[in-house]
Amino acid sequence: MTPAAIRPFAKADLEPSYGVWRRAWAAAVPSLDMDALEPGWRRQLPAEYLPARIVLAAECDRALAGFAIFDSARAWLDQLVVDPARHRAGIGRALMAAIRDIEAGPIEFRVMQANAGAIAFYERLGCVRLRPEASPTTGWPSWRYVWPAGRG
């Protein structure tokens, strides 16, 4: 497996990103109804995230392996998604390093409380759990985290 190349998300990444997103969320939280969630994501990614956020793609072996969505105006990580077939290959770390190159200060984000793998990943990076809160879009119980400046 070759290391991930991090680059700007391209239009050609849109369709493969839906599969990566679906596989990642289904693996992270098996109780989610992906058939119900996917149509909303297919609307949200091109309509909301792509025009207004920094979206980075991780490519391995000429295939999309993951992506990150970052709101630089708020120093907010919206999404970090890695194909479960590529977990533990350094892709999440590479995407986070690319985000850190954009924002040297603190970066905040939410993680679903049910997503134990993501929680462990972020805590290994030195992210700090701040408080519980519900996702404003889904109501899912989540943890608010910060990735302090200087970490990464």
Regions found by a protein language model. Name each.
Residues 1-12, 143, 148-152:
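Conserved N-terminal entry element of GNAT/NAT acetyltransferase domains
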Residues 102-114:
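Conserved GNAT acetyl-CoA-binding A-motif
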Residues 93-94, 114-143:
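Conserved active-site alpha-helix within GNAT-family acetyltransferase domains
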Residues 8-85, 96-98:
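Acetyl-CoA-dependent GNAT
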Residues 24, 74, 86, 113-115, ...:
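Short, flexible active-site-adjacent loop segments at beta-strand->alpha-helix junctions, enriched
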Residues 79-81, 108-110, 144:
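Short aromatic/hydrophobic contact patches that present stacked aromatics
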Residues 82, 88-101, 120-124:
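Conserved acetyl-CoA-binding loop-helix of GNAT-fold acetyltransferases
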